[in-house]
Amino acid sequence: MKISGAVLLAVVAVTPAAAVDKKATKFAEGLKNLDLETRLEQICDYEAMRRIGRDGKEFRPDRSQSNAVSEPKHEGSMLIANGAAFRSKGQWYRFSFTCKGAPDHLSVVSFAYQIGEQIPEAKWEEYGLWK
């Protein structure tokens, strides 16, 4: 099921701005087909890309994985991801985040993150990352 969710996230992440509203609606509709844990991971990964891209000019995330280095911890509507990774300009970076979703896991209520080090390309395969 996570692969399907990753595909949904990828469609929204690489879409031109003119089509974002339509793709975002399609993304939200697709989320309803996922189990609650996967849905929470998807909305939190999407929020991570949005926030990191918005908060500075250094990064332009096009992918985010809450479970890249280690599995995230689910606590109801809260997702704690200490082993997350995001891709920006062809490079992967470690980061951690805490994300609280709405009860239906279709939107984010609160989100905080911290960016870590760049992940060496030699580690990408080990973490399931790609170019």
Task: Report residues per predicted region.
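N-terminal signal peptide c-region/cleavage motif recognized by signal peptidases
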Residues: 12-17
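Mitochondrial intermembrane space
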Residues: 19-131
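Sec-dependent signal peptide recognition
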Residues: 1-8
